[in-house]
Amino acid sequence: MLDKIRFTVLLDRPFYQPGQTIQGHVVCEPHHPLEIDCVEGRLHGEIQYFQQLPPNHNRNGSPLPPSKTRVLIDEKAQLWKYQTVSEMLGLDVFYDENQNRHFSSESASASSSSLFTTAATFPIQIELPHFAPPSFYCPGSPVSIRFTLEIQLYNQGFKIASHEENLVVLNYESIKRQVTPKPVNFQKTFNFPKERSISLEMLLPTDVFTTTARLENCITICNRWKQSLKYVHLNIVRRISALNQNNEVIDTVKIDTTGVGLPSKTKIAVGETYSFRPTFNVPALPPNIHVNGLFKTEYSLKVTIGRAHNFVLASYEVPITIVTMDQSSRRSMQKEDILVDISASNNTLNNLPVDLLA
């Protein structure tokens, strides 16, 4: 049975990039005197694939399909080891005339562990591999990537206590930045029986946007359907795809974000052509990202037309790209610069402001 210990982990930053050193310290407060001779840190990263539920799945009666997990990183490092004063000075070992190694009697009788009766502080220093992918989690996504730092306390080879701390990893190499914007002008006609139709035209000055940017577009709808159109909705669709090791898509989930509708007009009458410019800002979404062999996220701008939100006649999507600033050219991070899909620990040595979207 593991001992009850209160752990407080304090790290030097709220997130890390591949190749950086995770530094900080951990404070251990035992409920009773505790002997420790070694403290290790275990860096663990895994990807989890979630199977999507079929439309006719009975949530109350049938169990959820199991998820599949693959370990990406499993690294260990010794953070602290008990040493006597003689051991630190190298005085505990001597050699005879045959160069045989012997321990002094003082060292042999000394304790091999340290007894802690109050809070003890141990350093943290462990390398994050350069190939580490970014942390990722989004409700409804077919895939998630999670990193943890486990602090393990040992005495005479037995693990007596442990604690896991979540880590956030950002990998800017997988984020699209060098994208050439281009204007978008598309027309689409949706045909119905008895020569009825709905025509849609949309003009976009660019197909590349930054987070929270104003989306300037013009939508024109020509209604030749049998009834008036009371529902026109504009929003961004997020598409998350899980990839296998050959970079092939094995599962995709579409997530609709909030959007806007007709600005003031209540309906588009039969035979009427109506143009409007909706007031719409890009939601606080992470940028397009592609992590080889793991996952990718893409976006599209969707226009939905119908009589009501539950009476949709037609919809059309146009691919767009959401980008972020080039962080490698900045010496300091600003609050509005970082948007990722993960929740971070609040235990940081310096409270660097950062938006972490769960």
Curated annotation (Swiss-Prot):
User: Which GO biological process categories is it annotated with?
Assistant: protein transport; response to nematicide
What changes when the gene is disrupted? RNAi-mediated knockdown causes variable hypersensitivity to low, chronic doses of the B.thuringiensis pore-forming toxin Cry5B but not to heavy metal Cd(2+) exposure.
Query: What this chain does, per the record?
Result: Involved in resistance to B.thuringiensis pore-forming toxin Cry5B downstream of the sek-1 and pmk-1 MAPK kinase pathway.
Q: Return any one Pfam family short name.
A: Arrestin_N
Q: What induces it?
A: By B.thuringiensis pore-forming toxin Cry5B.
Q: Which GO terms describe its cellular component?
A: cytoplasm
The protein's name is Protein ttm-2
Q: Which family does it belong to?
A: Belongs to the arrestin family.
Which range is the signal sequence, renumbered to this chain? Answer: none
